[in-house]
Structure formats: C-alpha cells, structure tokens
C-alpha cells in the first residue's frame, strides 16, 4: 500500500517524523548490520543514541562515489555497504518472536528473508568509472514501487490509461522504476526496451498500434522516435503526458517534444521530468505542467528518505530555499545502503516546504535547475589564464535556440596532439526554416555571452548521421557530450577572438 503524507502537513511535522524514522533506522538496521557504517561509527565514536533527529544526521560523515569504488587492495568494497543481518540478533527481536507466535516460524522466516535477502540489482552506468552495483531486497522493490506510484499519481494517470515504456532494457533504475510503478498501480504497460531491443522503427510501430496515453523514456531517444514518426507521416492522437528521465530536461526540450506530439495529433501534451540516481534506488517527479510554465520542482517522499542541501565547498548544511549540492539518506532501504550520499548534483533554488502551485502538495520539493558539479570544467581560454566553463548551460543554450533539432558537443585536441590546445566542436541538425547563418550567429552570440567561449567549428548533419553519432539505440544514454581528448596532459581550450572567422560545414 502507498504510504500517504497528508497534503496539509507542515515542515515541522515532516522533520519530526523523519527524525523518528531515522533514529529507528540507524539503531535497528544501519549500525548493527552495515559493515561499513558500523566500522565508521565505532572508529569515530558515533553512538546510535546521538542520532535522534534530522539535524543529528550531521554526526555522520558525508559519503560519495569514491567511497564505493573498488580498489586493488579492496576489490569487494561495494559489499561493505550491503545490509548483512545477524540471524541470531533478528530471532531475538520482539517483533520476530511475536510474528512467529502469531503466524508460525516459517512465516516469520519468510518475512525476514523478504526484508533482508538481496534478489535484484541495478547499477550505475559506468561513464566515469566501473559500474557500481546496488542490490535490492523485496523491501527495496516495495519502496521502488511506492516511489513509482507517487510519480504516476502525481501525473494524474487513470486506471484505463496505457503506458509505453521506452527506457532501455538494462539494470538501470529508470526502466525498472517504470515497470514496478505500473505493476503496483495495476496499469497496462508495454516496455519496448528502447532502441537496442526493438529499434526506432519498432518503437514507432508500438506507438501507433498501442495508442499510449503516457510515454516514458530518455529525452533524446523519445525525441528521435517522435521526430522519425512525424517524418514518416505516422499518427498518434492519444498521448497526454510525456514522462522523461535519465537525462537533463530543459525548457527547449519540452517545447520540441510537445511540438512533435502535436504534429502526431496529440496537442497540449504535459511534460514531466523526473530526477533520480542509482544510489537512492528511487526517483522523484515534477507536477505536470504545460511547456512554457515554470517547473514545480521534484516532489520528494519524506517517508522514504531525507534530502539535505550542503555547500559543496564547506560541506555546511544549508537552510530551505538555498542553492547547493544535493545529499541523500534513505530511511527504509535494505540491500545496498549509502548514508548522506553526495550526489554531485547542484540545485539552483534548494529545498522548499511551500505548497506546490500545481498539485497543492506540501511535501518537500527540490526546486530550480539541477546541474552536475563535475560539468564545471577547468579549461584554458588562453595559454596562461584558465576559465571555468559550465557545460551544464550548453543544454539550455542549444535546446532553447530556434532552428536546432538535436545536437552533440565534441571536445578534441588540435591535430589530435595531446600537447596542443583544446577545440570545442558543435554537431547540429537543423530543424525548421531558420537559416544556417542565423543559427550560427545565435550560437556564437549566446556562447560568448553566457559561457565566455566560442565553438571552434560548427558542423551541420543530416538526421540519420546524427543518430549514428549519438549512438541512438546502441548505448544506454545517447551521447550528447563527447570527449575525444587524450587525457595524458592537462586540457586547454583553444582561444577564440570576439570576431573570428568561424568554421562551418554541412555534412550530408
């Protein structure tokens, strides 16, 4: 059953309840059964009685992806984060004894196995390191179902609605959240497995045959499917909502997808972005909004986890509605568990407890733009003076510019020489009647104004060529940012004057 939070609950009551859940979780699950956190708390002298509230959570050190990475000295590092209960301790607990007396020893044993035995796994994508596995027990699958049901209910889905799941079939959070969400809500769902399983044509075929009311998937892949469907003259007038995950969703993406859906015969489509990560074993969604309306922010479930916002430099916990890095702590997880996990994601307007303007919900929300702190790259605009380039903003610039369909940013070295300067190259597909010259002018103008750097070259491609460049249907996440630089020396970015003779070329 879905655990409900009253819509009129206030910030104080939410925090008080989370404190009680946290205290119980640390005392009964994390400290006794997590090898990593038991050792950490013992070494640092952190007693379970010291953690009784959300504020007390700060006694625990922050964790990050580097804590999970295997090393030659410790090739089984990730196992230290798996909850590993002591059977004798569990058998002596009052709730276990009562369960055995009321329903028998076998039922009590099954209950404990459902709670603690890992039966399922997802993993990180492994773009910056080796994939990191995260294990789930039946308890975690129930949590995943609840988180998915929250998204479906927030999106206003009805029992008769049909869902087309275009997420790639893989041990990837987004695919399985969509699957378990539909199962828990008893909704019809066809999962295509994305491009690798059925290809773009297969997804278009299912789109026109099933006539889904809700389409879920990666923004880039959904764009390619809808774009090709329009080009082929296909029709689908049933789509009400697009639910997107796995990639950043900027305003320009929303407008493009909404326009494509309208060309297919589905006007006034709502676009919902979700935010989640493997380490949380769940995701959260915005309230539905028409493209052009401001985002409501991501609605959190305060019964399943605590979100803190910290200063990424000082690690100080910040107050509500203050920008900072997102830190997550589960409140009911089993299997793989990471406490106070630094996501590396920066939220521009922080955490709010105010009423959602669309859903009227009072649950906590993450508000504003989310960007990866790792996408602030140090590069050399000149040989002696470096500049921080915010690659997060490139999504907004390129998706918001009129006339650009899809795109790819490529970083490379001049002449492929590791000792040379960096080059920033844009690959574009022109969409609509806007001229190439005007698109180029707008790009250079926007890049200089916002990023203080200009692309070294702009190449225009046909749609099919861009699909190959982005590896649509071949990889888990389409490649919108491609770093082809050797990594043996520090990267530098080739200097551009304010009025360069920029290189452009059309590739057929």
Give the predicted meaning of each segment.
Residues 249-354:
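Conserved AMP-binding/adenylate-forming
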Residues 129, 233, 314-316, 476:
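Detector for glycine-centered tight turns/loop "hinges" at secondary-structure junctions
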Residues 4-7, 64-272, 280, 284-290, ...:
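Active-site phosphate/ATP/adenylate-binding loop shared across adenylate-forming ligases
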Residues 29, 152, 229, 257-261, ...:
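Hydrophobic, Leu/Ile/Phe/Ala-enriched alpha-helical segments that form helix-helix packing faces
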Residues 215, 327, 331-451, 476:
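AMP-binding/adenylate-forming catalytic core of the ANL superfamily
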Residues 1-123, 129-146, 154, 422-427, ...:
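Nucleotide 5′-phosphate-binding alpha/beta core
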């Amino acid at each position: 059953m879905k655990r409900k939070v009253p819509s009129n609950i206030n910030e104080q009551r939410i925090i008080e309840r989370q404190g009680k859940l946290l205290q119980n979780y640390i005392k009964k699950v994390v400290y006794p059964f997590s090898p990593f956190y038991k050792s950490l708390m013992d070494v640092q002298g952190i007693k379970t009685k010291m953690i009784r509230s959300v504020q007390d959570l700060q006694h625990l050190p922050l964790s990050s992806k580097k804590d999970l990475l295997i090393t030659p000295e410790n090739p089984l590092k990730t196992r230290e984060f798996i909850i590993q209960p002591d059977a004798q301790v569990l058998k002596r607990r009052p709730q276990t004894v009562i369960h055995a007396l009321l329903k028998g020893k076998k039922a009590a044993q099954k209950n404990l196995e459902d709670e603690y035995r890992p039966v399922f796994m997802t993993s990180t994508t492994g773009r910056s390191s080796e994939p990191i596995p995260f294990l789930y027990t039946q308890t975690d699958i129930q949590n995943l179902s609840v988180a998915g049901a929250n998204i479906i209910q927030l999106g206003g889905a009805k029992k008769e609605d049909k869902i087309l799941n275009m997420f790639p079939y893989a041990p990837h959070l987004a695919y399985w959240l969509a699957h378990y969400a539909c199962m828990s809500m008893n909704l019809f769902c066809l999962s295509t497995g994305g491009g690798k399983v059925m290809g773009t044509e297969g997804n278009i075929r299912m789109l026109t045959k099933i006539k889904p009311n809700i389409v879920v998937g990666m923004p880039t892949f959904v764009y390619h499917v809808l774009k090709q469907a329009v080009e082929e003259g296909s029709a689908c007038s049933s789509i009400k909502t697009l639910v997107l995950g796995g990639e950043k969703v900027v305003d320009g993406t929303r407008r493009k997808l909404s326009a494509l859906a309208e060309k297919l015969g589905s006007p006034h489509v709502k676009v919902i972005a979700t935010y989640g990560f493997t380490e949380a074993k769940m995701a959260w969604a915005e309230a539905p909004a028409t493209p052009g309306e401001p985002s409501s922010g991501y609605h959190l479930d305060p019964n399943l986890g605590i979100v803190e916002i910290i200063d990424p430099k000082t690690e100080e916990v910040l107050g509500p509605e203050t920008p900072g890095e997102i830190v997550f702590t589960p409140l009911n997880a089993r299997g793989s568990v990471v406490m106070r996990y630094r996501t590396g994601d920066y939220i521009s307007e922080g955490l709010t407890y105010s009423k959602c303007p669309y859903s009227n919900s009072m649950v906590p929300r993450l508000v504003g733009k989310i960007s990866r702190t790792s996408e602030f790259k140090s590069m050399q605009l000149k040989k002696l003076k470096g500049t921080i380039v915010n690659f997060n903003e490139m999504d907004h610039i390129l998706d918001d510019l009129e006339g650009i369909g899809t795109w790819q940013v490529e970083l490379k070295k001049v002449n492929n020489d590791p000792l040379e300067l960096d080059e920033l190259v844009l690959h574009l597909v022109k969409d609509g009647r806007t001229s190439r010259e005007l698109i180029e002018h707008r790009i250079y103008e926007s890049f200089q104004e916002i990023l203080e750097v200009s692309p070294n070259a702009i190449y225009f491609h046909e749609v099919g060529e861009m699909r190959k460049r982005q590896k649509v249907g071949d990889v888990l996440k389409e490649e919108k940012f491609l770093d082809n630089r050797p990594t043996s020396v520090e990267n530098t970015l080739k200097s551009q004057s304010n009025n360069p003779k920029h290189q452009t070329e059309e590739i057929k």
